[in-house]
């Protein structure tokens, strides 16, 4: 079903997929960030950063067959670090706002980091969109994982989040989210 035809090129159940990893830049804190390029046999591709689990490019043929990027992305690490819109990113622990930055769970009140006036937005001051994720290539998929520790941004419990990206010969992007908490 599976064999590696060359470095980072895979044939999985008869489908060719090329996955490459390149340096993208360095964060303000000195962490190296990589960009992953998933390309099908027709040459259409997606690019994903391990910083914020961000989609950077989706290049597919337009109606005339010309390769066209249909994803709103940026070109530099500093642009992503200063991005208030979370372009292409996985946000969290919560997407959107938590009014006044607090909630009650099982009778206990939790106070979260506030970053939008008095509100908590998209995970707080350092949400998932602003972190490096661990990345690995498995078969024809890119798997990104991060751990949010108990107390991070004020949230209770440890959380492990895994996001798996796939890219098909039909130019279909698949994204699978899996989370577990204690």
Give short role names for the model-derived ranges.
Residues 17-182:
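Surface-exposed acidic/polar loop and edge beta-strand patches at domain peripheries
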Residues 1-16:
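Short, Lys/Arg-enriched N-terminal segments with co-localized hydrophobic residues
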């Amino acid at each position: 079903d599976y064999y590696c035809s060359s470095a980072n090129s895979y044939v999985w159940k008869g489908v060719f997929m090329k996955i490459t990893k390149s340096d993208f830049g360095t964060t303000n804190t000195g962490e190296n960030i990589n960009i992953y390029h998933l390309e099908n046999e027709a040459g259409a591709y997606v690019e994903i950063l391990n910083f914020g689990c961000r989609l950077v490019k989706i290049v597919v043929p337009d109606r005339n067959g010309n390769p066209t990027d249909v994803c709103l992305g940026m070109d530099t690490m500093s642009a992503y670090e200063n991005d208030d819109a979370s372009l292409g990113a996985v946000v969290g622990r919560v997407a959107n706002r938590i009014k006044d930055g607090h909630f009650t769970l099982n009778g206990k009140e939790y106070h979260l980091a506030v970053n939008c006036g008095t509100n908590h937005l998209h995970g707080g001051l350092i949400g998932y969109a602003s972190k490096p994720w661990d990345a690995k290539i498995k078969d024809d998929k890119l798997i990104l994982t991060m751990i949010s520790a108990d107390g991070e941004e004020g949230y209770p419990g440890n959380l492990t989040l895994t996001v798996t990206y796939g890219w098909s010969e039909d130019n279909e992007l698949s994204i699978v989210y899996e989370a577990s908490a204690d």
